[in-house]
Amino acid sequence: MALIPTLIEIDNIDEKAIEDSKIETQAKHVIPYKDWGTKARSLDVFEIPIEFCKYRLENGRIRTEILTYEKLKGKLISNEQSTQEIIHKFIGNSDKKKNSDLIKILKKDGQTDPAIITADGFLINGNRRKWALTELNKDVPDEKFKKLKVVILPGTGNAERPTVTDIALLENRLQVLVTGKSEYSKMNKALTYYSNVKAGIDLTELLKDDATFTDAGSKNFKKKVKEFENEYFKPLELMNDYLEINKVQGDYEKVANRWMSFEALGSDVMSKLNNEKFKVENNIKNDEIGTIKAAGLNLIKLKDSSAVAGDNRYLIRQIPKWISNEELKKDVLKIGLIEDDNDHIEDPDERDEEWQKQKSTEIISLVKKL
């Protein structure tokens, strides 16, 4: 039996409110939805009140903040005003320089390209524009800042109503790919793709639109998909392991500034530990791999490694050299066996502070011997 694609949910009340309030502009715009871009199929551009345009929780630019907030404070409901205010704040803090520049551009030149919304008002792109126009309205109340130019995706009863996959592919084409716009951080890009894949969207579908990838049917394309997984998913999986070990699952903001350290652990260490030739040549036993990985995670956890290295990544990159020496490997394994035994401390920040006091000196002493 063929799988039936999951359609996005549409709030019929909000859909009708937008239908009743939209104002024609006589302009047309082509968007990369389904195969419409290649067919140059254009949509009407409308103006609608800015309050009818809503932020999506799936916004890739602030994926780290959303996931962390939901982990620490509970599930967010897209349609609730409190959720919209939280997302507005996250966007305002995401790139203050670009936000400030956009306000100046909108104030001087107005809107150019329209945003894209679902039939009930959720923004696929244009989140930063909504934020900027909302802020402009506070300081410079003006009718031209109270409406957003949009194209509206097919709605209820339309055969081309979006599926969940359609929305993921559209957002991917508009934002995640290199288009000259404000691009996601590597971590937010990883979280966006990873969430889509976990939701059942095929990674090859997401990547085949990327101009940096080759034809989807070629062997080279399959190789590049694997490289993408290694570059984005492997560090994220190590990050998830780190957060779980430290009892702060889902709190991505705690490690947002350590992405490159997880990259180094994946590319410079774990890739070698998964290589049979490397393990045989360096006498690495399979039951040592988990402890070596734990050593890498402990080195990432160090807040101050200045006594032994310029940054944690340098230490991570030394691990393959250290474990190739039987004597030095013993000290690496000792680092991996250092655990957080402060389970009685409930507050994660206090627990981490205590770990830094108790364990970091021990780790630094072992590193100095290497």
Regions found by a protein language model. Give the residues of each.
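Alpha-helix boundary/N-cap detector
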Residues: 220, 230, 250, 287, ...
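Non-catalytic, well-ordered alpha-helical scaffold segments
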Residues: 100, 130, 191, 227, ...
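Charged/polar low-complexity intrinsically disordered segments, enriched in acidic residues
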Residues: 323-370
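Amphipathic alpha-helical "recognition" segments
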Residues: 141-148, 187-190, 215-302
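Amphipathic, charge-rich alpha-helical segments that serve as recognition/docking helices
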Residues: 90-91, 138, 144-210, 215-237, ...
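Eukaryote-biased activation of long, low-complexity terminal tails and linkers
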Residues: 287, 291-329
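Short, charged/polar connector segments at secondary-structure boundaries
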Residues: 2-141
